[in-house]
Amino acid sequence: MNYRHAYHAGNFADCFKHALLADLVDAFARKPTPYFVLDTHAGVGRYDLEGDAARRTGEADAGIRRLLASQPAPLKRYLDLVRSLGLYPGSPTLIRALMRPIGPDLVGEGHGCCHDVMPGAGPASTPCDAEPDKGVDGGPSAAMTTGTGRRARPPKSASMLMRQADRLACCELHPEDVIPLRRLFHHDPQVEVHFRSGWDALKALLPPREKRGLVFIDPPFESQDEFATLADGLKRGHGRFGHGVFAAWYPIKQRAAVRGFHATLKMTGIRDVIAIELYLRAPTNAERLNGCGLLVINPPYRFAEQGQMIADAVLQGLGQDESGAGVDVIRIADE
């Protein structure tokens, strides 16, 4: 768990996946019924692009700052959100901004809550007026309990609110990153924060009670077998939530590893799978991040066309002109 996204926030890969993510979430608002979003690798939620970590790499200068300056028309929705949210939004902040708010007739005072789950523990809630509790080592403590030793339940009105509204569940396993994530959503009745593995959440949190939703998987790709782990996670998640939309980000260094991942997923028998890929350059140097892709299972209507337009706009806005730069839309499995 050495990966820290603060060093890479706002880079070209972030812009690509977040612009596509915004379009996916918007698609769910076309119907009035509530939807659920699971963000399996949420991070801290928002990032200071003027901070030491971001400045050390300068990746945002060649990413989001270029797009904000060039303003490609197909990215207006995404870029307007980035501007309006203050600190640069990570995926959970972006998703939350796109979710439909609870109507004023449903909201009661003091009923915001944020669920915290420790690895191996069942769901529990933290009182809304409490600061995020810490263990003796400064890390997140176990979920709070009542004086009788039983796990505290959220207020009834909060539970009712979450049943009637769009809902987001964020998972983060890094003990330092989960604390600011909990603070960010501590009073939000539509958001749950889980201190647990996102891979485990694919079993524990699916299927959702809302019956429709999006699973966003954005792993750090720290290990050599991450593509295999991702393929297995998608297979297990789809097995529990077959009609859900799954979106998984992956890096492109060399083409062979990516095509092997696609072939593995095709062998699972999962239907209706596409991938949208963006290349900054030809993927010939395995030491560089040459591009990235977003694989989508059960994509919304016309998402392939919309996704290609968004990816083309990202590439154009970044001003990339290296040999091999481009966008590709791949049909991995038919409907």
Regions found by a protein language model. Give the residues of each.
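Class I S-adenosyl-L-methionine-dependent methyltransferase catalytic core
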Residues: M1-V117, K134, M144-E335
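Acyl-thioester-dependent acyl-group transfer interface
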Residues: S141
